[in-house]
């Protein structure tokens, strides 16, 4: 079993065309290499649609809302700027019924993902996926999402 992150697997791979780096297509193109290594199962870290930008729960008001100058001796206090964080890994709730669009080299992420799974199966390999479901999430939604990926994309 080989666990991989779709974007991280090929983002720096110069043998892939630049447009395909970090995409489902790049993994599809690397299947012969993975098969040669003896890998029989690919485990994808979250590849469903999720929010990549972490939105801070506590926001800092912009200067024009919180600071007024009443004289020349006033020194403007330093404002704390929130650091933008990127959720690279995807272990957050998301849209469990869609492949991650930014992991596709084309406008049709669903077809590209379907092609990846189909090509893996043609080469005698399995494709399993990881999902993050928040504690307390409705179990019917979880089961519906898992069934969807099996029926729609034939993941194992």
Regions found by a protein language model. Give the residues of each.
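Glycine-rich phosphate/pyrophosphate-binding loop
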Residues: 1-11
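Hydrophobic faces of well-ordered beta-strands that scaffold small-molecule active sites
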Residues: 2, 42-44, 127-129
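Conserved, mostly hydrophobic/aromatic
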Residues: 4, 34, 44, 96, ...
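Flexible loop residues that form catalytic
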Residues: 9, 47-49, 101
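Aromatic- and acidic-residue-enriched carbohydrate-binding clefts of CAZyme catalytic domains
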Residues: 16-23, 54-122, 135-155
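Catalytic domains of carbohydrate-active enzymes, especially glycoside hydrolases
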Residues: 29-48, 83-84
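Residue-level detector of anion-binding/catalytic polar loops
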Residues: 40, 126, 154
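Short, solvent-exposed turn/loop segments enriched in Gly/Ser/Thr/Pro and often Arg
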Residues: 45-52, 131-136
């Amino acid at each position: 079993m080989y666990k991989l992150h779709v974007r991280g697997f090929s983002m720096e791979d110069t043998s892939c065309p630049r447009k395909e780096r970090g995409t489902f297509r790049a993994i599809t193109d690397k299947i012969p290499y993975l098969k040669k290594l003896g890998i029989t199962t690919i485990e994808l870290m979250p590849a469903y649609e999720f929010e990549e930008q972490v939105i801070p729960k506590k926001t800092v008001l912009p200067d024009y809302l919180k600071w007024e100058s009443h004289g020349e001796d006033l020194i403007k206090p330093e404002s704390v700027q929130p650091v933008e964080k990127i959720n690279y890994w995807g272990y957050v709730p998301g849209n469990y019924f869609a492949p991650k669009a930014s992991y596709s080299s084309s406008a049709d992420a669903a077809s590209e993902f379907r092609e990846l799974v189909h090509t893996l199966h043609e080469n005698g390999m399995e494709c399993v996926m990881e999902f993050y479901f928040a504690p307390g999430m409705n179990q019917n939604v979880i089961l519906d999402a898992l069934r969807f990926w099996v029926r729609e994309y034939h993941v194992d």
